[in-house]
Every structure is written in structure tokens, then in C-alpha cells.
Amino acid sequence: MNGLNEVNNKPLKKTRKPINVSWIWDVLIIVVLLIGAWFRFTGLDWDTGYHLHPDERFLTMVETAIRPVEHLSDYFSTSTSTLNPNNLGYTFYVYGTLPIFIVRYVGEWLGQTGYDQIHLVGRAVSGAFDLGTILFIFLIGRKLYKNSKLGLLAALFSAMAVLQIQISHYFTVDNVANFFAYAAIYVAVCIMMAESKPHNPDQEPVFIPLWKRLFLSGGHIGKYLVFGALFGLALASKVSIYALAALLPLAAVIYYSKLPKDTRGNESLLIWRNLVLAGILAFIVFRICQPYAFLGPGFFDIKINQAWIASLKELATISSGEVDVPYALQWARRPITFALENLVKWGLGIPLGILGFFGFLWMGWRTIKGDWQKHLLIWGWTAFILITQSMNWVRSMRYLLPLYPAMCLIASWAIFKLWENGAGAVRKITTLHVNWRRLLAVIAAVVTIAGSAGWALAFTNIYTKPVTRVAASEWIYENISGAIRLPIAGEDGKTVHQSLAYQNTATLSMDQPYVYGFIAQADEELTGVTLEHVLFSYSLDQTASYPA
């Protein structure tokens, strides 16, 4: 009994509460963003000022031509605005104007608006917007699947997606449009997963006038308005992102399908109101950010600019293959699987590409089997982009960029779904009991992360070395004599030979000197000028040839 009393008199040990470390997954997104930043900002000046990308070169010329308006009233004046490329000689401009406005004003702020400067500003802006897309794919995964780890893995895949890395090294409008698109998709996910106010069946119904329901009831109107604004920004960045508009009513339908039947009547009215207001706000934002799609000159002068429509129609004709242009001939006889093949092999890399495509098929099957409320938004967006671009005449990899973050999310979902399905799925292999599904999930995760990292590192290594055509050209200039050759002696004793062009019909005389502007390759001493061959005219009908 004494022993029993001693036991009873012992103080009870306090049970420790488990430490909540779920926050660490949210903090690790910073690490993922730093990884993505390294891939995107390494070697931004990869072509060392040669402007090798044709679309980027065009945008660079446009950027150096436009300039901020002196008065705010000039901004909407399509015929006179200094921000309108059409007024400055670029009459075929089919890109969104919001990205060039952003880059130009950032360049003004940094004092980097010259031809050899503004494209680097544009590349940095492009990379920064893609980092924002990575953040939103993390938020989408965390919100949609209630799993921060799933969102983090999706963000890591997106950070290492090679096409996203490549586009971030170009000054183009694609990353800006993609950022606003995925910000809008995140808002759409928030709408479809929103919870309605709890309904008490015992409570007496209260009559609320229609006007009060329309103007005073919430109904998640803020989310709809944010989506509308983001869609307007995306459309003003790239008009071909128009399919994004369908995701808002789709999110509303999914939200509506989850409501109790006795509350759907009131909610449907609010949903229609929200959709209309979101559409109005989208139009207003587009009017502000793509002002020259309208004639102006005032904000309320919203007659469509037919010159802008004509440019879009011309682009559509070229993209359809109806007109033969040299740069579109490459798309002839391309199979319908061409875009998908390039996405898997090059854009994502084989491990991530295969996993993403497998996850896409699996998610589609889950959607058909009844799990559509969770998957239809992301899967439908991915399927629409993949199908339409695969059937388009121009099947450029860049046109599939809007589905890349979604494919990364789907690949991450496939890994976690496989792990989830592995609960209890134990098989005996010889003397070992193996949960083969979870083992497969781990193998898939390790192989995909390692493969994607290796592919991203190998690709980014391109930007740390001279571009081959630039290196070859510099070797030619250095080792093969030109019409005019300038030996430039450096302090280290090495001589740099710079060749200059010379027009074969030009004449040298005291009265008519040959003038040629160039930038010296080295800031050192010019030791001479070599003319490889000169024809000296000493009479009207005779010439003598003298080597220089």
C-alpha cells in the first residue's frame, strides 16, 4: 500500500503539445523565390548588346521612340500621344501597351532609356513578373488543395521550368500577361472555395427589397472586382489571353453548385450582379491600360480604333497560315503533337514534362469521375490552352507559356495524390513490406526535382558564356582582315584588331573624305590604320592598283 501511495503522490507529467511547424512551408517559399531569381537574373546581358531576339529588338526600338506624355490629357489622345507607337512610325503594333508603359517609366526612373539600356530594364521587369507568377502558383496550390507543401513543390517546379527561365531573359510582354493571369486565377480559386453565410432553417424568412439586395449585399463582390481588374490588366498586356475571362463564371458556377438549395435563389442574383460589375471594371482597366485600342481623345470617347483592329486581323491572318511570310514557313507540316512534344522535352524537361502530362490525364479522369468541383478550373484552363495552341498554325513554345505554371501545379498534385492513395496500400516483396504507391511518389518527387534542377542549371549555363554566334563573329573580326583594319594596343601588350566596313564604290580624296562612325572595342591607343587594298586613280582612263 505504501508503494501504491508513493505512486499516487507523484506529480503528473504535463503532456507536451505537439509543436506546429506548418509555418515552415510558407517561409520556404522565400527560398524557392531566391532559386527562381538566380535562374532568371543570371546573365541578363547574354547577347552583350547585339539585340539578337527579333521581337525584343522591335520592342526595344518602340521603347526608345515613345516617351511620357507631357500632360495627362494627352494620354488618351490616340492621334497625338507620344506613348502611342503608331504615332512614331510603328504602325503595326499588336502587343499590349501596359508592359511597354511599365518598362518605359521604370527606365525613366533609372535613367536607362537608351537603345543599349532599355532592353535590359525590360528583361529585369520580365523576370520580376515571372517571380510573381511563381508566388501565385504557390498560393493557388495552398488554397485549392489546402496543402502548403503541395503549393511549395509546384512553385519549385515553376522556378526551374526552363521555358519560364528563357522567357525571363527576353524583354517581351508574355511574363507580364502571365503574372496577371495567375493572380486572377488565384482570385477565381478564392471565389469557388468561398463559404456562404450559414442558413438557419428555423429562422423566419425576412423580406429584403430587390434594390437592397443588389446594392447593399456583399456576396463576395470584392473578389469579383479584383478578378475584373486583373483580367483588364492581363488583356492590356496581351490580348490573346482573352480566354481568362471564362474562369470567373466557371468559378461562380462551382461556388453555386456547393450552396444549399434553399439559399441558391438569393445567391444567384448576387452572382449575376458581381459578374456584370466585374466585366465593367475589366473594361475600365483595359481602357486605361490599352488606351490606343480606342480613338479618344478623351477617356469617355470609347469608339474602337479600326487601325488597331486591322493590325489584329492581319496578325490573325499571318498566324493562320493563310498568307505566306518567310518566318511562318517553319510551321508547315508540323504534327498536332508538336507543341506538346516541345513542352515535355524542352520547355519543362523530360522528368517534369512526363509527370505533368501524366498528372493532367489523371486529373482529367478524376474530374470525369465526379471530383470536378476541385479540379475543373485548373484542368480546364490547361486543356483549353493545350488544345487551341496545338491546333493553331503557329505552334511556338512561347504560346504555351500560360499553361506552364498550371502544369507544374498538376505535377505536384500528382505526387501528393499518389502519396495519399498509398495509405494502407502495403505489398509484401520477399521479406519486406513495401508501400509501393508511397515509394513511387517519393521516387517521382526525387527524380523530377533532380532532373528539373539539372536541366535548369544546364540551360542557365548558356547565359554565363558568350553566345556562339557572337563569339564566332568576334573571332572573324579579330582574325580575318576587313576593308579597314584598326590595330588597338592595350596596356597589357596585347593588340586588338578591329575591322570596319567600307563601301566598295566609295572614293577617297582630299575633297571627299570617307566618314564612318564606330565604337572602339577597347579604350586604348590606336597604333595605325590598315587599308587592305586601294585603287588610286591617276587619269581619266587608267588606274593603278597599290597594296596598302
Language model regions located:
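Signature aromatic-anchored transmembrane alpha helix within multi-pass, membrane-resident enzymes
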Residues: 30, 409, 414-457
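Short helix- or helix-capping micro-motifs
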Residues: 36, 154-159, 186, 231, ...
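Perimembrane helix-loop-helix junctions
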Residues: 6, 187-219, 230-231, 244-283, ...
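Hydrophobic/aromatic-rich transmembrane helices and adjacent perimembrane loops
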Residues: 167-168, 174-178, 234, 239, ...
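Transmembrane-helix signature of polytopic, membrane-embedded enzymes
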Residues: 31-32, 137-160, 202, 208-218, ...
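Membrane-interface alpha helices of multi-pass inner-membrane proteins
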Residues: 210-238, 340-342, 385-390
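Transmembrane-lumen/periplasm boundary regions of multi-pass, lipid-linked membrane glycan transferases
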Residues: 59-74, 78-81, 85-114, 118, ...
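Transmembrane-helix motifs of polytopic, lipid-linked glycan transferases
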Residues: 124-145, 183-187, 358-360, 364
